[in-house]
C-alpha cells in the first residue's frame, strides 16, 4: 500500500510539471506575437514617411534649379489673402492721412494765433512749436513782471532758440527789426546835426570864370569828405548866426555846357564886382522845414563839408573867351 501511494504522488507531480511547461510555452508564443505586431506597424510608418519625402523631392525638382531656402516655408498667396492684405493697407493709409490732416490743421490754427502770422512765409512745424513755447513763456513773464509787449526783452524772449529767418520775421512783424532801429539812430543823429549846425559863410566874388582848377565843380566835390557831427558843431558854432542871404540880383540863364563843364551866366548887374557873403542852407533829411534856395550843383550824398577857404577870383567878361581857349587847347 505504501508503494502505491508513492507512485500516485509522483504521477501527480509529473502532471503538474507538464501543465506548467505548457503554460510557459504558450506565454512565450504570445510575447513573440506581440513583438511582431508593432514591428509591422513601424514598417508601415516608415513607408509612408519615405513616400512623402519622395513627393517633396519631386516638387522641388519641378520648381527648377532654384536655391533651397532654409526655414519655414511661406504660405501660398491666395486671392482671399491678397484681398485681406490690400484692405489692411488701405485702412492704414487712410488712418495715417487723417492723422496728418488733423495735425496740419492744428498747426495752421496755432500759426494764426502767433504774433508773426504771415501768409507768404510759412513757418515749419518745429519752428511753430518753438515759437509757441516762447510766446507762452513771454506772456507769463509779462503777467508776472508787468512789462510791456513792445519792449526789447519781450522780443528777445520770443526769438530765443529760433533760427535766423524766423527771428527776422518776428522782429519785422513787431516793427523792431534792424532797419527800424537804424532809422531811429539816423533820426537821432540828424536832429543833433540840425541843432548844432548854424550859419556858415564864405567869400564869394563875381560869378565870372573862377581860377583853376578850371571852375569844374566835380573836382571840388571829389575832395569833399563827410565830417563827424561833433566837429561840425565846433566848426560852425564860431560864426555869427545873424547873417542873411544876399538879395536876388537877377534871373539866371540856363547853364552853359562846354564839353561837360558847366558855367553859369548871369545878366548884368551893377554889383558884379562887389564881394559879399554867401550862406548855404542845409535842409534836414526829413524835409521838415520849407524849401529854400540851394546851389545848382546838388549831389545825392548828404551834408558834405565845404572848405571855408574856398575863394574865387574875379575876371572880366572879355577875358573869359581867352581863358576857355587856353583851357581846351591844353
Curated annotation (Swiss-Prot):
Predominant location category: nucleus
Query: Domain bHLH spans what residues?
Result: 87-139
The GO terms describing molecular function are: DNA binding; protein dimerization activity
Q: Where in the cell is it found?
A: Nucleus
What InterPro entries does this protein's entry cite?
bHLH_dom, bHLH_transcription_factors, HLH_DNA-bd_sf, NeuroD_DUF, TF_bHLH_NeuroD
| Ranges annotated as biased composition (Acidic residues) | 52-64
Q: Where is this region: Disordered?
A: 23-80
Matching entries from Pfam families are given as: HLH, Neuro_bHLH
Superkingdom as given in the UniProt entry: Eukaryota
Can you cite a GO biological process for this protein? amacrine cell differentiation
Compositional bias (Basic residues) spans? 67-79
The record's section on Gene3D superfamilies has: Helix-loop-helix DNA-binding domain
Q: Share the record's PTM remark.
A: Serine or threonine phosphorylation within the basic region may regulate neurogenic activity.
Q: Does the keyword Cell membrane apply?
A: no
Print the keywords alphabetically.
Activator, Developmental protein, Differentiation, DNA-binding, Neurogenesis, Nucleus, Phosphoprotein, Transcription, Transcription regulation
Which GO CC terms are listed, alphabetically? nucleus
| Free-text tissue specificity from the UniProt record | Expressed in retinal interneurons amacrine cells (at protein level). Expressed in neurons of ventricular zone of the retina at postnatal day 1 (P1). Expressed transiently in amacrine and horizontal cells of the inner nuclear layer (INL) of the retina at P7 until P14.
Q: Could you give the subunit structure recorded for this chain?
A: Efficient DNA binding requires dimerization with another bHLH protein.
Q: Per its database record, what is this protein's job?
A: Probably acts as a transcriptional activator. Mediates neuronal differentiation. Required for the regulation of amacrine cell fate specification in the retina.
Q: What is the protein named?
A: Neurogenic differentiation factor 4
Q: In which organism is this protein found?
A: Mus musculus
What lineage is this protein's organism placed in? Eukaryota, Metazoa, Chordata, Craniata, Vertebrata
Amino acid at each position: 500500500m505504501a508503494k502505491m501511494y508513492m507512485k500516485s504522488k509522483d504521477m501527480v507531480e509529473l502532471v503538474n510539471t507538464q501543465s506548467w511547461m505548457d503554460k510557459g510555452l504558450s506565454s512565450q508564443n504570445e510575447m513573440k506575437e506581440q513583438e511582431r505586431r508593432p514591428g509591422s506597424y513601424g514598417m508601415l510608418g516608415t513607408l509612408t514617411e519615405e513616400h512623402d519625402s519622395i513627393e517633396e523631392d519631386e516638387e522641388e525638382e519641378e520648381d527648377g534649379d532654384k536655391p533651397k531656402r532654409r526655414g519655414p516655408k511661406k504660405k501660398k498667396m491666395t486671392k482671399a489673402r491678397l484681398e485681406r492684405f490690400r484692405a489692411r493697407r488701405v485702412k492704414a493709409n487712410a488712418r495715417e492721412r487723417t492723422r496728418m490732416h488733423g495735425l496740419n490743421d492744428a498747426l495752421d490754427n496755432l500759426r494764426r494765433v502767433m504774433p508773426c502770422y504771415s501768409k507768404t512765409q510759412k513757418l515749419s512745424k518745429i519752428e511753430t512749436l518753438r515759437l509757441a513755447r516762447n510766446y507762452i513763456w513771454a506772456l507769463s513773464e509779462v503777467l508776472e513782471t508787468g512789462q510791456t509787449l513792445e519792449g526789447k526783452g519781450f522780443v528777445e524772449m520770443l526769438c530765443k532758440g529760433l533760427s535766423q529767418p524766423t527771428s527776422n520775421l518776428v522782429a519785422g512783424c513787431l516793427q523792431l527789426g534792424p532797419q527800424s532801429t537804424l532809422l531811429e539812430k539816423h533820426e537821432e543823429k540828424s536832429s543833433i546835426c540840425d541843432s548844432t549846425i548854424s550859419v556858415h559863410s564864405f567869400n564869394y566874388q563875381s560869378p565870372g570864370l573862377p581860377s583853376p582848377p578850371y571852375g569844374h565843380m566835380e573836382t571840388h566835390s571829389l575832395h569833399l569828405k563827410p565830417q563827424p557831427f561833433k566837429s561840425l558843431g565846433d566848426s560852425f558854432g564860431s560864426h555869427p548866426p545873424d547873417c542873411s542871404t544876399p538879395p536876388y540880383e537877377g534871373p539866371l540863364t540856363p547853364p552853359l555846357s562846354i564839353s561837360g563843364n558847366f558855367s553859369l551866366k548871369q545878366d548884368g548887374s551893377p554889383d558884379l564886382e562887389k564881394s559879399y557873403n554867401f550862406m548855404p542852407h542845409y535842409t534836414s533829411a526829413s524835409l521838415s522845414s520849407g524849401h529854400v534856395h540851394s546851389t545848382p550843383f546838388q549831389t545825392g550824398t548828404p551834408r558834405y563839408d565845404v572848405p571855408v577857404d574856398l575863394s574865387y577870383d574875379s575876371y572880366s567878361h572879355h577875358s573869359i573867351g581867352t581863358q576857355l581857349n587856353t583851357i581846351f587847347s591844353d
